[in-house]
């Protein structure tokens, strides 16, 4: 059995969880609930970065981060690969994943700054910069929504998990406004069983 260190609210964990479902590997993974913010956590022994997700293989190898874990899982099933082999399709999938993960990075940095720091230490300019990054990147996705029309890849999985996280943590900011194409795509994508089964919860 593989072991997955996870947090139920992490969008990066969700990406891995969706992959395990889509690849049919869920039964081969033992999930271990982990709070990376707990000062007593032993997560650092598995991932020296102290982050989830982290995967431990049956032979004891530690695999991180989510991108590497997903590619590792993709090599373990016999269906069509989620990391495409054809160069152009692969480039699109990897770019979509990079953009989705970058939006998440900005969203989480902003979340920590705005909601975790004491108000007197919050840096508004930093938060505005992250918000600009998020919105500019979402606009890029809207303008190139057709990139999501191909078969299921790591790119579409990453984008779907990212948009789900924005609904989860930024429900008061409507990312759908002015992005009808992206909103329509996500409305359908969110109905996949792998997405319904991995909705984040506190």
Model-assigned labels for residue ranges:
Residues 1-124:
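GST-like domain detector, emphasizing the conserved glutathione-binding G-site
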Residues 26, 79-80, 174-176, 196:
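Short coil/loop linkers at secondary-structure junctions
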Residues 68, 181, 194:
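Residue-level recognition of oxygen-bearing side chains
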Residues 70, 74, 94-97, 138, ...:
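Non-transmembrane alpha-helical segments in soluble domains
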Residues 100-187:
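GST-like fold's C-terminal all-alpha helical module
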Residues 112, 199-202:
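Short coil/turn segments at secondary-structure boundaries
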Residues 184-198:
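Charged phosphate-binding loop/patch that engages nucleotide di/tri-phosphates or the phosphate backbone
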């Amino acid at each position: 059995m593989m072991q997955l260190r996870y947090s139920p609210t992490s969008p990066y964990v969700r990406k891995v969880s969706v992959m395990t479902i889509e690849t049919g590997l869920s039964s081969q993974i033992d999930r271990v609930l982990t709070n990376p913010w707990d000062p007593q956590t032993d997560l650092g022994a598995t991932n020296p970065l102290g982050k989830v997700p982290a995967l431990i293989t049956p032979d004891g190898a530690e695999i991180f981060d989510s991108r590497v874990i997903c590619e590792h899982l993709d090599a373990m099933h016999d269906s069509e690969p989620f990391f495409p082999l054809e160069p152009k399709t692969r480039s699109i999938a990897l770019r979509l994943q990079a953009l989705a993960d970058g939006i998440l990075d900005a969203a989480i940095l902003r979340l920590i700054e705005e909601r975790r720091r004491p108000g007197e230490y919050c840096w508004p300019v930093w938060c505005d910069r992250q918000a600009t990054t998020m919105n500019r990147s979402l606009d890029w996705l809207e303008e190139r929504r057709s990139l999501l029309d191909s078969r299921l890849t790591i790119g579409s999985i990453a984008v779907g998990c990212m948009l789900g996280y924005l609904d989860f943590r930024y429900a008061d900011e409507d990312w759908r406004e002015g992005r009808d194409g992206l909103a329509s795509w996500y409305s359908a994508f969110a109905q996949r069983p792998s997405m319904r089964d991995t909705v984040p919860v506190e």
